[in-house]
Amino acid sequence: MIFIRSLLFNIVSFTWTFLLLVLYIPILLLPRASMLAAIRFWIAGILALQRVLLRLDFEFRGTENLPDGPCIIAAAHQSAWDTIAFYAVVDDPAFILKQELYRIPMFETYARRLNMIAIDRTGGAGEARRMIRDVADRLSAMRKVIIFPGGTRSAPEDIVPLKSGISALYRRSNVPVVPVSLNSGYFWGRRSFRKRPGRIVAQFHEPLLPGLDGSDFDRILSARIHDGNRLLLDEAQDA
């Protein structure tokens, strides 16, 4: 039954996505707010299909830890779900995305229209400086920047070393960093066709305020993300 539900979800969600990609082309000419509203409508559809076809619900906890103003959200990354679901709780997120995604047909057009941040992970120090400038630009526009500091999707039980980019952003940005733990990979794993029913939980932890020593920041951020991942995985497995 899980296979059939997963197959049906893939067919319907891909059809929904392709249809809206075509219908949204004229919206590219309108103000960015129109494109943002259109993307939120697409994501609402995906999340509704997830609930109905996969019987997979979701919950955000600790949203009171999100500052009203700009901040950096440093989230675990276990699933494709992570790249869309934050729109449910963040009004206008600016995702930091790997450059390879921009090779997907039409993806680059929409990502640039939404003013996302693309990074070349092989670009070295120059690319890191550009990322810091781009993040500063989005924060100055009162947006929340979302980064996956582990760099790529991982299994929910993995303890992934955090990349140095998040430390550089913390030092240079002077805004709170909000850690996020997930258990999405247990239900909707990377490169996995089957998607389990249940409830995905994303937990926003207490923000790390500016002023921490670099080593303390790295240690606390890693502990909050990975300890939270473990607890949420245990919760999913015990349900």
Label each region the model flagged.
Residues 1-28, 64, 137, 216-239:
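Membrane-interfacial terminal anchoring regions of lipid-handling membrane enzymes
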Residues 21-39, 44, 51-53, 68-124:
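Catalytic core of membrane glycerolipid acyltransferases/transacylases, capturing the structured
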Residues 54-60:
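Membrane-helix interfacial anchor on the cytosolic side
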Residues 60, 117-120, 210:
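Short acidic-hydrophobic, aromatic-tinged amphipathic segments that line or gate anion-handling sites
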Residues 60, 73, 95-96, 202-204:
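Generic preference for hydrophobic
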Residues 60-67:
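Short beta-strand-to-loop junctions in surface cap/lid or active-site-entrance loops
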Residues 129-239:
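Non-catalytic C-terminal accessory region of glycerolipid acyltransferases
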